[in-house]
Amino acid sequence: MASDINALKYKKVLLKVSGEALMGNKQFGHEYEVIKKIAEDIKEVIDLGLEVAIVVGGGNIYRGINAALVGMDRASADYIGMLATVMNALTLQNVMESLGIYTRVLSAIPMMSVCEPYIRRKAKRHMEKKRVVIFAGGTGNPFCTTDSAAVLRAIEMNCDILLKATQVDGVYDSDPKKNPNAKKYFTISYKDVINNHLQVMDTAAIAVARENKLPIRVFSIKEHGNFARVIQDKGQYTTIGE
């Protein structure tokens, strides 16, 4: 399949996976079969010959903003949330390596005994060698979401596109789980996402993507094989761009 790489529009991609996606039907933590399916979807894209990076959230373990609402110092809460992303990254790495996928975890918060520190040149070199790079620790700064981290890392790695895996198959004008008449956008501009206060990503992340002309594609992680389909312009998704 790697011989088809020249026919693909996107050759270097970053996948954003929320922590909640790793829970499956659980209320907390990880569901192995769900993580295995995600890893299999990633392998399918690697087999196409693409360079792949991942940013993983931590909401299945800890949400800093929620802790701040009940009285914890926001910066401290966010740092704990960053540690949760490292736990998720190591879990995903373990499952991916069990499938024969060469994987490296790079953390914005140095943890030398468990993973590599984030160094841009090293991360790019790993990707050139067709290793999957999982970026953990968010941006390394409080008050920043993992969506912002995903946009920043995608730009730093010179990725062609950012793919955001969610619980729904695209961007809607309201929550389709609550509103059966919600309208789906097949394409939408950065400006309209911001002006319409759509909750697909935080405003800061969308603004940085717009400034750097990074296209974003939103799709459902629930359907097995969707990652490879979406990167080949197939399946259901919404593209955010100019």
Curated annotation (Swiss-Prot):
Keyword Membrane listed: no
Activity regulation (UniProt): Inhibited by UTP.
Key words, A-Z: ATP-binding, Cytoplasm, Kinase, Nucleotide-binding, Pyrimidine biosynthesis, Transferase
Entry keyword annotation includes Nucleotide-binding: yes
GO molecular function: ATP binding; UMP kinase activity
Transmembrane segments: none
CDD domains: AAK_UMPK-PyrH-Ec
Pathway entry: Pyrimidine metabolism; CTP biosynthesis via de novo pathway; UDP from UMP (UMPK route): step 1/1
GO terms under biological process: 'de novo' CTP biosynthetic process; UDP biosynthetic process
Subcellular location: Cytoplasm
InterPro entries with a match to the protein in the record: AceGlu_kinase-like_sf, Asp/Glu/Uridylate_kinase, Uridylate_kinase, Uridylate_kinase_bac
GO cellular-component term (any): cytoplasm
Binding site for UMP: 58, 78, 139-146
Function: Catalyzes the reversible phosphorylation of UMP to UDP.
Similarity field: Belongs to the UMP kinase family.
Subunit structure, interactors included: Homohexamer.
Name this polypeptide is given: Uridylate kinase
